[in-house]
């Protein structure tokens, strides 16, 4: 969806996007708290790992989206960027343009962060990011408190300067609905 959006910025381009699954019309896709109801349905590939020796040879279920927007239409909507060290390692291996400092401007350009304003986040981009205060519960607050009491530092912005620590989750939600890559990048250019 992101690539289709970017390619469509040039009016000389005609873009065809093929999706293996169907449209993202299933009601549970739009309702943030209903995401688990999408597992093992027609919008899920239903992948499993090979038998895993460390868990008594069980196969581990891997839900993956099979609908417009892919897994961004079926996952738990947590917005977590890759770790700085991973991007820098890719660049060190010869992948020019993939260092953290080189990809950060693209994260910023894509993002519309509702709460955080600093040099690591964007405003006005197509991908909405929020703390989704409706999901803030006493249990979530107790979890963060327990982590801090056990030596894990609180990190109010794990998509910022430092990723380590405990935090409430940043979500891809807008107006109390899932904000998938299809909603953010594809539907605006259809």
Predicted feature descriptions by range:
Residues 1-190:
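N-terminal redox-cofactor-binding region of secreted/periplasmic oxidoreductases
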């Amino acid at each position: 969806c992101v690539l289709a959006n970017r390619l469509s910025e040039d009016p000389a381009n005609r873009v065809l996007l093929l999706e293996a699954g169907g449209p993202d019309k299933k009601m549970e896709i739009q309702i943030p708290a209903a995401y688990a109801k999408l597992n093992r349905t027609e919008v899920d590939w239903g992948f499993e790992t090979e038998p895993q020796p460390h868990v008594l040879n069980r196969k581990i279920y891997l839900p993956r989206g099979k609908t417009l927007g892919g897994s961004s239409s079926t996952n738990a909507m947590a917005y977590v960027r890759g770790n700085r060290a991973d991007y820098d390692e890719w660049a060190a291996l010869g992948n020019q343009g993939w260092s953290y400092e080189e990809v950060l401007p693209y994260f910023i350009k894509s993002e519309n962060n509702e709460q955080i304003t600093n040099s690591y986040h964007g405003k006005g981009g197509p991908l909405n990011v929020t703390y989704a205060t409706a999901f803030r519960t006493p249990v979530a607050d107790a979890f963060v408190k327990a982590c801090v009491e056990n030596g894990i530092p609180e990190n109010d912005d794990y998509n910022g300067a430092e990723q380590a620590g405990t935090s409430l989750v940043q979500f891809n939600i807008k107006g109390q609905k899932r904000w998938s890559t299809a909603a953010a990048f594809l539907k605006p250019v259809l």
